[in-house]
Amino acid sequence: MSSTPSNQNIIPLIKKESIVSLFEKGTRQDGRKLTDYRPLSITLNYAKKADGSALVKLGTTMVLAGTKLEIDKPYEDTPNQGNLIVNVELLPLAYETFEPGPPDENAIELARVVDRSLRDSKALDLTKLVIEPGKSVWTVWLDVYVLDYGGNVLDACTLASVAALYNTKVYKVEQDSNGFRVNKNEVVGKLPLNHPVVTVSIAKVDKYLIVDPDLDEESIMDTKVSFSYTPDLKIVGIQKSGKGSMSLQDIDQAENTARLVAVKLLEELKKQLGI
């Protein structure tokens, strides 16, 4: 089974002490402040054969998300909604401990957090993906690939997922004697998205809380908490990872910081998506 870099004790004690000594001065190895995000770039329509796609670079972390739409049956418990299926893969080329094969528990956890953030925020209006109530709907396959693991992959996965959804084309549906079929020659619009959503992760290293940890920082962190926000700053997801603990004061401070960062991140995301 693959293991995430943060599970590997690869940072020598002397290097950890060096990193923490920088935290004491309010700075980090790459020159960022403790509350700074790494540079973000988004390339839309990166995978030309997908219905929508986006390549996200967050520092050295690189994630590609792509969508495919197909006509499908609705789930029995949601006959008047389309379907959203999120998959995440940690490709072996992304990090030395990632192995080929089916998604492991780390990839499954990432997919669940991204899925939950999208659903609970109602970013995608599934009710508008119905073709024939109770019989035919659109299924949106959202596949996310981690190409380079440079730390804080969850935030990058959320950004790539949202960007790919906004980039997705919806094709004309035609009906004949055999039922519904997709006419790929005619685009009728985009997915019915209500708003974007972002995830902001805060790592705790000793007594310090740091935004958007890179690979070295994740390797020495005690724990990490991630908050997902809508543009009105409603929390639509919280995820804790790592073996360490956080006090209520830590969580409160982390959320206050994440909220401020989310405002800037949402502005940057909207700017790069042109929405």
From Swiss-Prot:
Pfam assignment, any one: RNase_PH
**GO cellular-component terms in the record?**
cytoplasmic exosome (RNase complex)
Q: Which UniProt keywords apply?
A: Cytoplasm, Exosome
Q: Which SUPFAM superfamilies match?
A: Ribonuclease PH domain 2-like (SSF55666), Ribosomal protein S5 domain 2-like (SSF54211)
Major localisation: cytoplasm
The record's section on InterPro entries has: ExoRNase_PH_dom1, ExoRNase_PH_dom2, ExoRNase_PH_dom2_sf, Exosome_comp_Rrp42_subfam, PNPase/RNase_PH_dom_sf, Ribosomal_Su5_D2-typ_SF, Rrp42_archaea
Would I find Transport among this entry's keywords?
no
Among the GO molecular function terms of this UniProt record, one is: mRNA 3'-UTR AU-rich region binding
Q: Which GO terms describe its biological process?
A: rRNA catabolic process
Superkingdom, natural source: Archaea
User: According to its UniProt record, where is this protein located?
Assistant: Cytoplasm
Instruction: Give yes or no: UniProt keyword Cytoplasm.
Output: yes
Into which family does the record put it?
Answer: Belongs to the RNase PH family. Rrp42 subfamily.
Q: PANTHER family of this UniProt entry?
A: EXOSOME COMPLEX COMPONENT RRP42, EXOSOME COMPLEX EXONUCLEASE RIBOSOMAL RNA PROCESSING PROTEIN
- Subunit annotation: Component of the archaeal exosome complex. Forms a hexameric ring-like arrangement composed of 3 Rrp41-Rrp42 heterodimers. The hexameric ring associates with a trimer of Rrp4 and/or Csl4 subunits.
Q: What does this protein do?
A: Non-catalytic component of the exosome, which is a complex involved in RNA degradation. Contributes to the structuring of the Rrp41 active site.
The protein's name is Exosome complex component Rrp42
Q: Which organism is it from?
A: Saccharolobus islandicus (strain Y.N.15.51 / Yellowstone #2) (Sulfolobus islandicus)
Q: Which gene encodes it?
A: rrp42
